[in-house]
Amino acid sequence: MKTTFLDFEQPIAELENKIEELRYVQDDSVLDISEEIARLQKKSQDLTKTIYSKLTPWQVSQVARHPQRPYTLDYIQAVCTDFDELHGDRAYADDPAIVGGMARFNGQAVMVIGHQKGRDTKEKILRNFGMPRPEGYRKALRLMKLAEKFGLPVLTFVDTPGAYPGIGAEERGQSEAIGRNLYEMSRLKVPVVCTVIGEGGSGGALAIAIGDQVNMLQYSTYSVISPEGCASILWKTAEKAPDAAEALGITASRLKTLGLIDKVINEPVGGAHRDHAQMMQGMKRALHDSLKGLTTQPVDQLLASRFDRLMHYGKFKDASAA
């Protein structure tokens, strides 16, 4: 698949186009231009490293939304075996925006759950662009309770712009479904590892991201609102989105500094979409490390540690002491 380049990647795109042109020339010519191709490839790699070493939060948000990034089902198929997808919330309907089911991770039975956006237009519409309705969150909770019943660790993959704000979703109790998940996940008697793989949008992301360890991919984002949404509210124009992204602190490195996540998982140079295979290897190692220390903990200790980490979210300054 040909790589889709973002606006700030245009210098890289120009080099890659030159490389492709030279490859076509080499195929139709007796001239050996392999050295020139290798030189341009090295230049492209170095330029990619340089650009990605100083991304702004707004640029990171663009990478997090890249249409070629691996999605939940890609990770499940790559790092798990024997995946058996389960459907429906047993109350209203099945929501394709959230996928989940039983699988094996390194031979251990687990429950995997995550948002799924879709690749082409047809699938994007089917999966509502990764924006779950209440039945999606209730399906996720049903699978978590099933995991608790059978003593299975839960692995969640977060990648959503946010919960769907449609009238029907609100009528069916969107806020209640999200709130219920927050409550139940905080008390789930099995290990829960959550990983933000793309967009972590507001309560729609948080509804499957309460756990014992929260990871983020290097170029993923996690925020109470999108930069465009924040800019529209504060400055009445989406053009201020880069400023909003900076102020919101949406990047993995910033959230790690604030103590809101536990680990940043490195991505391949140029983002996860540039090398799916390498990203899958990194994900598998990270999940293995996350689970290793949790599966042996007694339930009481697991719940106490989870409660303690939740209670330590957020910091404030006492104005009276200033």
From Swiss-Prot:
Source domain of life: Bacteria
Alphabetically ordered keywords of this record: ATP-binding, Cytoplasm, Fatty acid biosynthesis, Fatty acid metabolism, Lipid biosynthesis, Lipid metabolism, Nucleotide-binding, Transferase
Subunit structure: Acetyl-CoA carboxylase is a heterohexamer composed of biotin carboxyl carrier protein (AccB), biotin carboxylase (AccC) and two subunits each of ACCase subunit alpha (AccA) and ACCase subunit beta (AccD).
Gene: accA
Pfam families on file: ACCA
Principal location listed in the UniProt entry: cytoplasm
Family annotation (NCBIfam families): accA (TIGR00513), AccA_sub (NF041504), PRK05724.1 (NF004344)
Compartmental location: Cytoplasm
GO molecular function: acetyl-CoA carboxylase activity; ATP binding; carboxyl- or carbamoyltransferase activity
Entry protein name: Acetyl-coenzyme A carboxylase carboxyl transferase subunit alpha
Domain called CoA carboxyltransferase C-terminal: residue spans: 39-293
Protein species of origin: Laribacter hongkongensis (strain HLHK9)
Catalytic activity as recorded in UniProt: N(6)-carboxybiotinyl-L-lysyl-[protein] + acetyl-CoA = N(6)-biotinyl-L-lysyl-[protein] + malonyl-CoA
Cellular component per GO, a single term: acetyl-CoA carboxylase complex
Enzyme Commission number(s) from the entry: 2.1.3.15
Biological processes annotated in GO: fatty acid biosynthetic process; malonyl-CoA biosynthetic process
Keyword Cell inner membrane: no
